[in-house]
Design a protein with these regions (language model features):
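Conserved ABC ATPase "signature" region
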Residues: 96-103, 149-170
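Conserved ABC ATPase signature
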Residues: 173-179, 183
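Conserved catalytic motifs of ABC-family nucleotide-binding domains
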Residues: 196
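Catalytic Walker B motif of ABC-type/P-loop ATPase nucleotide-binding domains
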Residues: 200-203
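Conserved beta-strand-loop-alpha-helix hinge in the C-terminal portion
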Residues: 252-282
């Protein structure tokens, strides 16, 4: 590893950080309420350098797509945004991640509280099979010991925002595992929304879904972005073009993953500045 300050597990040190030299902050929108920003992020798994000098702004209340070939560090970067990489043995990180201007790796940060603000939806739907649909939505509240006066209203609100209420309102007491794959993924989105996050991280949320279910999830993503910041990893270029406002193209060319280019999605897909970006979005490799 290099001389950048390393952060591993619960032993976090933010006295010195790598300065962002090769980063490509998105050029539209401002980091503000519900906004994210990274500066000079490096990640290692033991001695393997996975990400190098990732500096990126995520404009508030919009969708940022992370695109690039498999193995370039997109999902790892997503984990860094709410410190989920700390669950992986041998993981180490250097750099800074800001949520609403506050460094989430600073000493004394309440990691559990931070993760309530930065929710996550995984690649495969993962409802709790032993719980009903309603219990699944409210599970996060119970785990975080958050008291809610009107659970019925919150349940309807979250399922409505996830585009699922009309489909399940008459069977809230049936198992979450009884739903179709697409419905299960929207149930997981509703579960993430119940704790009122400012940011939602989505790691290929449609990769296991059929086209019709994918469309419904995409519609949900676009609607949610009106009042929250969404970061989505996708290998589907058509999906990236449909749902994201901005894109960052990651690439690993025999070394750690870096950002080749980041800009408005319309620019990335029509007039990218780097030929490697053009080759990727046009399907010449990856």
């Amino acid at each position: 590893m290099d001389d950048a300050t390393i952060q591993t597990g619960s032993n976090m040190n933010t006295d010195a950080h790598s300065s962002p030299q090769g980063g490509n902050p998105l050029d539209e929108g401002r980091v503000g309420i519900n906004g994210l920003q990274t500066k000079g992020v490096h990640v290692w798994f033991n001695k393997h350098h996975v990400l190098e000098d990732i500096s990126l702004d995520f404009p508030a209340n919009s969708v940022t797509g992370l695109i690039g070939p498999s193995g370039c560090g997109k999902s790892t970067f997503l984990r860094v945004l709410n410190r989920m990489h700390e669950f992986i043995p041998g993981a180490a990180m250097a750099g800074e991640v800001f949520l609403d201007g506050k460094e989430i790796y600073a000493p004394g940060v309440d990691v559990t509280a931070m993760r309530l603000k930065v929710g996550r939806v995984f690649q495969k739907p993962n409802p709790f099979p032993s719980m009903t649909i309603g219990q699944n939505v409210l599970a996060g509240l119970k785990l975080a010991n958050i008291k809610v006066k009107d659970k019925d209203s919150l349940l309807e609100e979250c399922l409505t925002r996830a585009g699922l209420w009309k489909e399940v309102k008459d069977r809230l007491k049936t198992s979450g595992g009884s739903l179709s794959g697409g419905q299960q993924q929207r149930l997981c989105i509703a579960r993430a929304l119940a704790v009122k996050p400012d940011v939602l991280l989505m790691d290929e949320p449609c990769s296991a879904l059929d086209p019709a279910s994918t469309l419904k999830v995409e519609e949900t993503v676009v609607q949610l972005s009106s009042d929250m910041t969404i970061v989505i990893v996708t290998h589907n270029m058509q999906q990236a073009a449909r749902v994201s406002d901005h894109c960052a193209f990651f690439l690993s060319d025999g070394g750690p993953g870096v950002i080749v280019e980041a800009d408005r999605t319309s620019v990335i897909f029509s007039t990218p500045s780097d030929p490697r970006t053009a080759d990727y979005v046009q399907g010449r490799f990856g």
